[in-house]
């Protein structure tokens, strides 16, 4: 029972620390972003029960738990929450090992809409070529991005990645170090 209490304490400390960092980063962003329709921190933490399923390794279960599936189905009801989770799952800066294929297929594994995270798999534009700098046929502008991710600042994506990292790290730290 003491291990569970320590795990909860570690998770709470990580969430509070990340919330403080996210608040400071959001306040110092150079361009104002509209208020998010959903709290990405809360959405990422709701999927903590999916950790054992998305963690790489031979000990990962073949199916996500019922708790995990309930959380996934709840998140899928809000397109902004799906946008937050897509940004977190597909981030190249995620510091912890996560089986991205399993993470993106959580809805299908839980019996929900298999295409829910399909937009996550769309290739991102190449960062080496800025929009409008193509030497193509006379200045065709790039089409603006659609959906919740278009309105989000880069800081929001970074915050989402940090939150998912904390949600993954807290149970692992509690399990292996306490």
From Swiss-Prot:
Propeptide feature ranges: 150-178
InterPro entries: Bifun_inhib/LTP/seed_sf, Bifunc_inhib/LTP/seed_store, LTSS
Cysteines joined through disulfide linkages: 50-68, 69-110
Modified how: O-glycosylated on hydroxyprolines; noncontiguous hydroxylproline residues are glycosylated with arabinogalactan.
Keywords assigned by UniProt, alphabetized: Disulfide bond, Glycoprotein, GPI-anchor, Hydrolase, Hydroxylation, Lipid-binding, Lipoprotein, Membrane, Protease, Proteoglycan, Signal, Vacuole
Entry-linked Gene3D superfamilies: Plant lipid-transfer and hydrophobic proteins
GO cellular component terms listed in the entry, alphabetical order: aleurone grain membrane; side of membrane; vacuole
Sugar-modified residues: 99
Lipid sites, type GPI-anchor amidated alanine: 149
MF (Gene Ontology): lipid binding; peptidase activity
UniProt keyword annotation of Glycoprotein present: yes
Acetylation in keyword set: no
Top-level taxon: Eukaryota
Subcellular location(s) of the protein: Vacuole, Aleurone grain membrane
Reported tissue expression: Expressed in roots, stems, leaves, flowers and seeds.
GO biological process: proteolysis
Signal peptide: 1-26
Membrane topology: Lipid-anchor; GPI-anchor
Pfam families for this protein: LTP_2 (PF14368)
Record-stated family: Belongs to the plant LTP family.
Name of the protein described by the UniProt record: Non-specific lipid transfer protein-like 1
Biological source species: Oryza sativa subsp. japonica (Rice)
Lineage: Eukaryota, Viridiplantae, Streptophyta, Embryophyta, Tracheophyta
């Amino acid at each position: 029972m003491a291990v569970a209490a320590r795990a909860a304490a570690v998770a709470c400390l990580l969430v509070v620390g990340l919330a403080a960092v996210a608040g400071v980063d959001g306040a110092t962003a150079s361009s104002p972003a509209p208020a998010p329709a959903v709290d990405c921190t809360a959405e990422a933490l709701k999927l903590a029960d999916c950790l054992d399923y998305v963690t790489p390794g031979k000990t990962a279960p073949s199916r996500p738990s019922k708790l995990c599936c309930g959380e996934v189905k709840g998140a899928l009801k809000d397109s902004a929450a799906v946008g937050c989770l897509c940004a977190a799952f597909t981030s190249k800066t995620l510091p912890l090992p996560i089986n991205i294929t399993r993470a993106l297929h959580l809805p299908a594994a839980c019996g929900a809409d298999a295409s829910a995270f399909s937009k996550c798999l769309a290739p991102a534009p190449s960062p080496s070529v800025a929009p409008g700098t193509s030497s193509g046929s006379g200045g065709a502008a790039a089409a603006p991005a659609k959906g919740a991710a278009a309105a989000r600042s880069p800081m929001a994506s970074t915050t989402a990645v940090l939150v998912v990292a904390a949600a993954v790290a807290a149970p692992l730290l509690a399990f292996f170090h306490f």
